[in-house]
């Protein structure tokens, strides 16, 4: 990324369109504080979530229940609440008491998404939208929770698919060849994204 500079206000959903392999993971990790920029500074004035899909905080040989309680203690939140919330949202039933290492990638994504939403952040970082799931009930609950969080928090969704951003994004940006261009609407961002990626 080259001289990327932007500001995100609390209570906004920013959708960032970017092709795979063009700095998407780097952008998210720097916002979360997992990587430092080579130059410049990142100023954070709120509590920012770990990126959805980041498994660095959990232990795969432990069960979902054990991971919930461990992460809750790290963040100073009631372990019983975090466990109950995750059980309710991810709907893994008996698998909740099995090691994460035995989960499919879809099950891991559902668990990590539920764990992230169980914790109280001002800003949530989401890579490629909600986990893809055939579970209609999970999709319904997760969508409703995200819409509700938008009223009081900031959500940043980074994706290479404009349709993933359409449901939630209020403002948009395009990250391409190291440059980040901000737009007031997703439709404006999509026009540049389509031009850059199809030319």
Describe the predicted segments one by one:
Residues 47, 52-136, 144:
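ABC-family P-loop ATPase nucleotide-binding domains
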Residues 145-159:
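Conserved catalytic loops of ABC-family nucleotide-binding domains
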Residues 168-185, 193:
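H-loop (His-switch) and adjacent beta-strand-loop-beta switch element
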Residues 53, 159-167:
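Conserved H-loop
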Residues 10-73:
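ABC ATPase nucleotide-binding domain signature region
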């Amino acid at each position: 990324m080259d001289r990327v500079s932007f500001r995100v206000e609390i209570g906004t959903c920013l959708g960032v369109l970017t092709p795979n392999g063009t700095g998407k993971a780097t952008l998210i990790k720097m916002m979360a504080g997992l990587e430092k920029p080579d130059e410049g500074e990142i100023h954070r004035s709120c509590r920012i979530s770990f990126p959805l899909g980041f498994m660095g905080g959990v232990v795969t040989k432990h069960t979902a229940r054990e991971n919930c309680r461990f992460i809750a203690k790290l963040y100073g939140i009631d372990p019983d609440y975090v466990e109950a919330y995750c059980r309710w949202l991810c709907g893994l039933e008996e698998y909740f008491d099995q090691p994460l290492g035995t989960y499919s990638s879809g099950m891991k994504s559902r668990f990590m998404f539920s764990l992230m939403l169980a914790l109280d952040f001002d800003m949530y970082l989401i890579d490629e939208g909600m986990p893809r799931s055939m579970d209609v009930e999970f999709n319904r609950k997760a969508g409703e929770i995200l819409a509700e969080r938008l009223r009081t928090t900031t959500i940043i969704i980074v994706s290479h698919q404009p349709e993933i951003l359409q449901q939630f994004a209020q403002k948009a940006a395009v990250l391409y060849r190291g440059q980040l261009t901000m737009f007031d609407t997703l439709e404006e961002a999509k026009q540049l994204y389509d031009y850059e990626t199809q030319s």
